[in-house]
Amino acid sequence: MSYKLELLRRALEHNVLKFGTFTLKSGRKSPYFFNSGNFTHGADLCALAEAYAETIIAMNVDFDVIFGPAYKGISLAAITAVKLYEKTGKSYGFAYNRKEAKSHGEGGNLVGAEMEGKKVLLLDDVITAGTAIREAISFLEPKHVKLAGIVLLLDRQERLDPEVNESTIGRLKKELNLPVSSILTLDDIVDFTKSDLTAAESKAMDAYRQQYQAK
């Protein structure tokens, strides 16, 4: 799909996608790193919005509000709401959380559209072990919303357990009984970059996939 290729091209151009040796939040060593925070210009955000919107339209899921967890999810949800309005004419609500509750003004830890009783689509960037997504779901539960689905920028396709061939997204789908989609996957990254990597980088990626990727 053209929007995937455009995102991957920009990811390499702006060092969103890098190869080397990186330590993930989990402590695992990885031969590649994807930092969506390096999408910092209007053209990049336009490409991101296009990709999220096309993925959501293809999901054909019914929802009222787009929720983006702080911090990276905030801008992702905002630009996606704009792009969906341009493409479909539907004006979806947009909301996000504060990591620190505000004690003055409107107060609280939720900003944006009213969500109580609404169908909410959760957006985020990269999923590895699913910790951030579970935290976002825990935040939403007491708000009395109906979670309609989850859309991610990148699925690293990693096993939850080295001994079990099940991905984080696979487990989430089973646990939540909800649609969970990602724009990009590790397979997409490998296919797009295979002719550009050095021999050492290719070897490291192959070894990493053999050890950690869910088949």
Swiss-Prot record:
Pathway: Pyrimidine metabolism; UMP biosynthesis via de novo pathway; UMP from orotate: step 1/2. GO terms for molecular function: orotate phosphoribosyltransferase activity. 5-phospho-alpha-D-ribose 1-diphosphate binds at residues 25, 71-72, 98-99, 102, 104, 124-132. One of its GO terms (cellular component) is cytosol. The keyword DNA damage does not apply. The keyword Coiled coil does not apply. Keywords: Glycosyltransferase, Pyrimidine biosynthesis, Transferase. GO terms for biological process: 'de novo' pyrimidine nucleobase biosynthetic process; 'de novo' UMP biosynthetic process; pyrimidine nucleotide biosynthetic process; pyrimidine ribonucleoside biosynthetic process. It catalyses: orotidine 5'-phosphate + diphosphate = orotate + 5-phospho-alpha-D-ribose 1-diphosphate. Orotate binds at F33, F34, T128, R156. Its EC number is 2.4.2.10. Pfam families: Pribosyltran (PF00156). Belongs to the purine/pyrimidine phosphoribosyltransferase family. PyrE subfamily. Catalyzes the transfer of a ribosyl phosphate group from 5-phosphoribose 1-diphosphate to orotate, leading to the formation of orotidine monophosphate (OMP). PANTHER family: OROTATE PHOSPHORIBOSYLTRANSFERASE 1-RELATED. Homodimer. This is Orotate phosphoribosyltransferase. It comes from Schizosaccharomyces pombe (strain 972 / ATCC 24843) (Fission yeast). The lineage of its organism: Eukaryota, Fungi, Dikarya, Ascomycota, Taphrinomycotina.
